[in-house]
Amino acid sequence: MMKKLPGFTQDYLPSKATTLPDKTRLERAVEPLCARHPGECGILALDNSLDAFAARYRLTEMAARTLDVQYYIWEDDMSGRLLFSVLLSAAKRGVHVRLLLDDNNTPGLDDTLRLLDSHPNIEVRLFNPFSFRTLRALGYLTDFARLNRRMHNKSYTADGVVTLVGGRNIGDAYFGAGEEPLFSDLDVMAIGPVVNDVANDFERYWRCSSVSTLQQVLSLSEQELTQRIELPESWYNDEITRRYLHKLETSRFMADLDRGTLPLIWAKTRLLSDDPSKGEGKAQRHSLLPLRLFDVMGSPTERIDIISAYFVPTRAGVAQLLNLVRKGVKIAILTNSLAANDVAVVHAGYARWRKKLLRYGVELYELKPTREHETVVHDRGLTGNSGSSLHAKTFSIDGSKVFIGSLNFDPRSTLLNTEMGFVIESETLATLIHKRFTQSQRDAAWQLRLDRWGRINWIDRQQEEEKVLKKEPATRFWQRVLVRLAAILPVEWLL
């Protein structure tokens, strides 16, 4: 059923947090640490999927004042439901919860979002909402220009003093919580000055003209308003959920978080985020995150390590990379193989540039989807998972600066979606990412090389002797044909 959307020009009054007479538990834990490191931020890279979920879950339990939560995808699965439940519990003890979701990935969540939004301490808003709630695809026929622009940002901020920013959405595939293939990903937990920047950025999006309150998009009946605000008990009661929660509670990360002994890296950290007006196509070109990113990071002189789930460099991007190679910069790129890519058509936008990049000396590595000798998913961190698909978005320059965030190296991230991330000045973190990258080159990825005839070979170096593969590994004929056909279509700007 067609529902008329509100105008996208309304200004919202800023939400007010619960007023507490004393400092919260998180504030008391964080402030002494930050006082010892003025001007720097405490950073913890979360490449383990269980730790990444534990951070969100426990910070929600610990929060006493506010929770500001912003995501592109929130799945209606075990991990998504657990976080909904713990957010509702926080609201019931007086925490003010603000939930900002991109509406492109909320099918099936309308009833749950209605229930949450009906609690006096929870506000739910949607970015670029769809007018058709059931047959959403119809919206693209009448409103493509707006609906094609999405909010890809991801942040989770507790009491204004701790934040989580990175590449993970909310869902079992990001947290190793179910039987689905695991997305290898990377988040950052941060304390210090950058948290205030994230809070202010959330406020920009919360108040922007692309965002509508849930009540403006979904009607709320009197019956729903008066019913008891409870989520189904079954969400906690099945055996798989109980086992997962037991793993959380007994994890070393959870113990370190509770004791305040997490191994933080202290470094200057800066938030970069797109202007929310990008969601309307009104952002100034100079404000686009990718253009600002390289100004902030500076020009590399030695090496760049790039890890990007979706790598579509475009003609202009290839020219920039090759210009760096000519200046003596070593460039290594890890992305998904066709077999590991969850969006096969995006692979076409990358595959067309592989030979040129290889000819000029760029190192290309493609993540394997599985390890043949393993039958279950094991989380080995950023790039070393079996049964996985790469979803991380990070790169480091000259072993001294690192970007971690939501930004993919593709036209969609550059021109259409809003993005965010941290620039972290840390040799320690850059070295860690380079080490993980180097480990993955042998264990979890194929290296691409050109043979004497200029054809691409995939080199498997997992065994003592190199194994040379002549075609896209672990793929079927129809997949390879589809990618070749997609490469012909003029859709690179959409990828």
Please state what every model-predicted region is:
Residues M1-H152, A158-L495:
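Charged, low-complexity intrinsically disordered terminal segments
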